[in-house]
Structure formats: C-alpha cells, structure tokens
UniProtKB/Swiss-Prot annotation:
Domain of life: Bacteria
Motif 'KMSKS' region, chain ranges: 527-531
GO BP terms: valyl-tRNA aminoacylation
Subunit composition and interactions: Monomer.
Classification of source organism: Bacteria, Bacillati, Bacillota, Bacilli, Lactobacillales
Annotated residues for binding of ATP: 530
The protein's name: Valine--tRNA ligase
Motif position, 'HIGH' region: 50-60
Record gene name: valS
Ranges in coiled-coil conformation: 811-883
Domain notes for this protein: ValRS has two distinct active sites: one for aminoacylation and one for editing. The misactivated threonine is translocated from the active site to the editing site.
CDD domains: Anticodon_Ia_Val, ValRS_core
Functional summary from the UniProt entry: Catalyzes the attachment of valine to tRNA(Val). As ValRS can inadvertently accommodate and process structurally similar amino acids such as threonine, to avoid such errors, it has a 'posttransfer' editing activity that hydrolyzes mischarged Thr-tRNA(Val) in a tRNA-dependent manner.
Catalytic activity: tRNA(Val) + L-valine + ATP = L-valyl-tRNA(Val) + AMP + diphosphate
Organism field: Lacticaseibacillus casei (Lactobacillus casei)
Amino acid sequence: MEPVSDETLAPKYDHKAVEEGRYQEWLDEDVFKPSGDKKAKPYSIVIPPPNVTGKLHMGHAWDTTLQDIVIRQKRIEGFDTLWLPGMDHAGIATQAKVEAKLRKEGISRYDLGREKFVQKVWEWKDEFAKTIHGQWAKMGLSLDYSRERFTLDKGLNQAVRRVFVDLYNQGLIYRGEYIVNWDPQARTALSDIEVIHKDDKGAFYHVKYPFADGSGYIEIATTRPETMMGDTAVAVHPGDERYKDMVGTELILPLANRKIPIIEDAYVDPEFGTGAVKITPAHDPNDFQVGNRHDLKRINTMNDDGTMNENAGKYQGMDRFEARKAMVADLDKAGLLLKVEPIVHSVGHSERTGVQVEARLSTQWFVKMKPLAEAAIKAQQEPDKKVTFVPERFEHTYLQWMENIHDWVISRQLWWGHQIPAWYNKQTGETYVGMEAPKDIENWKQDPDVLDTWFSSALWPFSTMGWPNTDAPDYKRYYPTDTLVTGYDIIPFWVARMIFQGLHFTHQRPFQYTLIHGLMRDEQGRKMSKSLGNGIDPMDVIEKYGADALRWFLITGNKPGQDTRFSYKQVEAAWNFINKIWNISRFVMMNLGDLDTPQQPDPSTFDLSDKWLFAQLNETIKQVMDLSARFEFGEMGRTLYNFTWNVLADWYVEMSKEVLYGDDEQAKAAKRVNLAYALDQILRLLHPVMPFVHGKLWLALPHTGKSIVTASYPVANTAFENADATSAMDAIIALIRGVRGIRKEAGAPLKTKVDILVKLTDPALKPIFEQNFDFIDRFVNSKAFTVGTDVAEPKMAGSAVITGATIFVPLNELIDLDEEKAKLTKDAKKLEQEIARIDKKLNNQGFLSKAPEAVVAEQRTKRSDFEDQLTSTKQRLEQLQRA
C-alpha cells in the first residue's frame, strides 16, 4: 500500500476533488449490477420513475438518497441486489411542456400533426433523460443502468396492452359517456387526483327562472351562469313544503326561452340557498346522476377547448369566462338578475396546466374499480400479500382511498402516451380490443386517445422485470420487489394502483414494504413551488457542499413520513462532519507506520480505552443494523455521528496519541491495528449514506477488495462486549468534562494547573479514577488530585455533579473575586436589558401582526437564549458570593 501523503490524501477535505470522476470509476468497475450469486438472497427496488418533464428537484434527491442507502446497505450485507432505474413518459405533463415550448415559436401541435409532434416530444425526452442521468450520477446513485426502462419502451407497451386487453375481456374496462374532469387547455380528461382544488374569488348569481304561465318566478343561485344554456330542469327536495305544489309545473329557461320542468329529488339540500337548484346533466357530476334518475336530456354547451358550442346560441364561439360576463349582462338587461353575491369558493384546477377544470360530458374509457379495490383491501389481511406501510399510519390513508374509490377514467385526449388498443369498424361501428391491430386494418380506425400515465406506471414493478413473460429471468429472480420508497402525496396516484394491479395480474404484492417520506419544504416551512420561487436545485447544493453532505442532511433531519425543512446551515454542518472524518482519517493513516494489510484487533492487548472503543463500536453496529431494518435512517445517522465524533474523534484518537508518540513499539503496533480497524468499520458503516468520501478514504486504508461498494458490512462481535469498560470510561469522561466545564466558567486555561477534589457517593469509582490518573491528567492538568468519600468541600470552589461524585476545583488562586463579581453583575444587567427590549417587541401587537413569522420566531428564540444565559450568570454570581 502506498504511504499516505499530502498527494495521496489532501490535507484539507475538498468535496469536488473527492467526487470528481468517482462515479464513472464505479460504473467501470461494474459494482452496481446484481452479484449473480444464486446462493445469496435477492433484494430489489424499482426507482419511482421521474417524469421526463425537466430537471429533478430536492424531493427527488431525498427520495433517491433513501433508496440508495437501502440498496447499498443490502448489497454489502451480502444480498443479491438490483436497483432498477427508469423514467416515466408523463403524458399530459410532458405534452404540456412541449406544447408550451411550441407556442413560444408560434406553432401548435395541430400545425405539426400527430406523428411530427410525437417526434418533438421524443426529442424533449432524450434531452431531459441526459439531464436526469447526469443528476443521478452527481447524487452517487448505485443504479444498474443495463436494466434501465422507460414507460414507453416496446416491452412495457406489451405489458400495458396485455393488461388493457385482459381487463376489457374480464369486464373491468368499459367505455361510456360520463361527466369527467376536463382540462380545456390540454383538451383531455383528468382523473380526480389530477385535479387540485384552490380557493378562488367568485360569486353567487341570483337569477329569476319565470314560470311558463307568467305567475311569478323561482330564484336560483348559481356560480356558473355560463352553463345555463345546458339546464334541463330545476330540482327541489321532496319534503320541501315551499315547492310541493310547484313540482311538475314548467319554467322558462332564461336567455334560451326553452321550457324546463320542476322536479323533486333527494339530492337537493333544502337548507342551502333558496332550496331550488338548476340541473345541468352535461356539466355537473351530481346533476348527471339526477338526470339519469329523471331521464333528462343531456345538453353539452362547450367545446373541448372551453369555448361555447352551437348549443349556447348567440354565445357560440365565446370563451367560457367571456360567455359568463355576457350572459350576466344580458340577464341584468332583461331584469332577470336579482343580485350578485361575492364569495370565495374551492375550484378545481388542472395539476399540470393550472387552468380551471370543467365538468364535461364525454365518452371515455374507465376501469371498474370496486372488484379490484375489494381484492386489494382483503389482501391487507393476508400476511403473504400484505404491504407493510412505514410509518404504519399511512396504511389507513391507503385503505380509506380504496374504500371510497370511484371508477377510474383512463383515456386521455393526448398524442403522447400508450395509444389505446381499441379499433372501431368504419362500416359497422363494432369495437375490437386486442394485442394486435385487426388483419383487415383498412376497415378499422384505432381509438386516437392514449392511456392515463398512471395506467402504465401502475405496472412498473412487474412490467420492468419482463412481465407478461413470467419465465423472464429478472421476473423470476427479483419480483416481487422488496421496498418501494415514495412520498405520501402519491399514495392514491401510484402506490394504491401498483398494489391492485400487482395483486390482480401477478397474484403477489408488488413490494413487501413501502417507505413513505414527507414533502421537502423551505426554511420557513412552505412547500417548495415554482409560484413561490423557493425551490432549491440539488445540483447547486452539490456544487457548493458536495453530494455526501447533501445526502447526510437529507437522511438525518427527519423521521419516516414527516416533512422536512431544507437548511443550508444543516448541510454546512454535514460538510463539517465530513471534514472531521477526513481529518481523523488522515491522522490515523499517517500514524500507521508499516501496517499495510488489514488486521484483526487482539483483545488481549487492549487497554481501557481500547476495550471502551470496541464495546462502543459493537453497540453502534447493533443499533445501526436495527435502525436501518426499521428504516429509521435519521436515528441511524445520529448514532453514527455520535460514535464517529464523540467516541472516535473526540476521545479515542486523543487517547491514542500518548501511545503513538511513546517508545513502547509493541503498544504502538497494537494501537495502529485498533485505529485502522475502527476507522475501517466506521467508513463501511457510513458508506451507504456518504459513498464518495468514504470510498476514497477506505481505499487509502489497508484493505482487501476493489471497492467499498462491495466490501462486507460490519458485524457485531461478542468478543468486544464489555459493560465494565463502558461504565468506567463513561465515569472518566464525565469527570474530564466536569473539570473542563469548571475551568471554562472560571476562565482558567488548560495550561494552568488546578487542584481537583472528587467527593464520591459511589466508592466503586475510586479505583477507576486512581488507576487511570495518568490518562485523566492529560485532559485536566491537575496540581493535586484527591479522590474519596470523605473529601471536604473547599471554600470558593467551582463544582460539577456527575453520576456517583461531585467535583470541586478551588478558585481562589485562579480569579480575582471582586473583579469577577463586578463582571458578572454587569453581564446580568446587560442580559436583563436585552430581555426587556425583546419583551417590548413581543408585547407590541403591531410588531406581531406585521413582522414575518420567521422574524417573530427568531426574537422568541433570542429571548430564550438570553434567559438561559441570565440564569447561568446569576447562579455563578451566587456561588461566588457564598465563597
């Protein structure tokens, strides 16, 4: 092994130098592919395929980091691992992006035609796939690119067709006329979960609907007067006495001068508004149901682009919102508008284009969901089919959605996607559904619509493994997959659909565990979004701090299922942690002497610090294994941090210096082995989270194997268990910290020798402190060191209480008593003034109402800090006044 020098391991951690080129080395070494070891247990994850709509955001970075930790850890635990990458064509989202780009060039998709437009989308896909690949590489994701899939691949298209055809033949896919959510900009139907509801300003328009016999009118309140031309009835509740004698009579529909009946239906809420509602079966899902019950005509008044059609009379050709204004003006002119009542109400908007969604009568393809949902709900009671949600509470979210499910509209009026495998006979209108086109294709026309993106995504865990070929090697070896990692926001969109499709077509759960994480928010707790301009590009963070620091932040700041707030301060703290590891690694490696092969520590050579170190390492390994198995990566990170910083760096490395710089060659050789082994183990433990830096450092240590990526994971060793050493070192460290704390308060530097008196309440500590005095004294620099149960408390002494003892350090020789009292009195007064100043702000209602929430929170934090400082200062002053 080449000796460590400034050339082989730089004096200072430089994340750019460490990470540059390392990913390509891993790819060249082929370490991300499955091992192929048939004796090893398989473990597989399929990546939630990112949309090819653009660059990956911080949520993707979080999601994929969690997956990478799982797969890297399982790989070095000895599993035959597969992490399968891929991307989603994202039908409406990608098409909307490309159409927006074309609009800037003054072109529409209709100008190009379907074939040329789809080619443009493929070009977009290729461009952003390269971007995503680059981002995956920067993140250090250990993906097997030889198995990468795309949701429009030929193989996946075969799976999609197979599922569609089978569900159709089973009577679970049907085509029918129904009210759907309609996006007028994308000109396509949307499922309920593709609609986002926002509070918008609107109005209740109170309109007179005159009786046909001229005897008066009924008052109707509507938020959507533009749909009036599609009204076919007015409905009242059967028990509403106000209208009992009116049921069956006719009204004149304003503006249309068409007669419509008054009907009674239990759907109407008699307490809401006037208790009478207009029924528009072609423009409202509830009205559609009422219309079916009463055999009402369905009059669609809108085109697919949101303009009014021929059924809208003189308003034909107007945009829907222009038509609203025109109709309201005409109603007012005709004396039929009673009043306009401003309101704020929840209005559905397209998730992708942002436009207001229309409820529109349309012929679409649907999946009959009840039988599929019932089977999936039942499977949660069967141990071999149950999907375990982590955290468990999200199983309720999943089941609640499944129990209240509606039929799923799966057709989309788009050009980018899986075209529906249905053909209509040009002469007879007969429908044919099949894997292949009819042989006499000249007599048939294929349905122009494509399938909802989520239809193909729902098949992702098994379609990527070669299904419907159940003899495909990957399907047989790696399906069902083991763990899905995803956000709670797409449990209904994606998780639920993968489960019911997996159960229906493979008769197995698609994954055993689904690890749910929250949303990535900004430092103020707001969801990151384009509209707020608060999104953070993970590549910018990597440029400044490195992928390892970002990855460490992403897993240590939260628990499963919780949202997390992005914090540059915490990413910087992660970088500082890595820098600490770098520094102790350099120290260890530059003090290994001629040790050039890895060796096992020999417990027979251990001093107390060695026994303690390896007992702590053993416990850390056990905790990490337990926490990672439960996906508690945040707690796992804190456990690793504690060992690395508080055990190895702060104490053991410092303890080792006396031996390493001494003359006992045998002791030095043993200490080198112990340092190298401990560092090797912690690098292996940290590698799944921070692969770049720990891969680099591990290669500089004595090692076997070509890469830390495939190096075996640490295993707890019972020979290292030592409760006595742990309790002894805990007491010694507490003693050292206690003395240091007294020194700090007294302003006495370590170079100044002090008397130390330790009064014991636990006599068992006496031999521990006395036998390890030489070691303790290196950290406390005592002039005299007295330990016993009968030690008297000296006057004017600083003190600290630890488990089993009280420490005293006489201060009379260290400080000027009067000068220190004066200083503390002055400090206390200044702190009281600061607290009073903040209280004045916090008691000012003007400040509280106008200042940003973050500013108010900062003032409260400052006040709390000042309170703590004041308490400490007063306690110190009281201590000196008693002396």
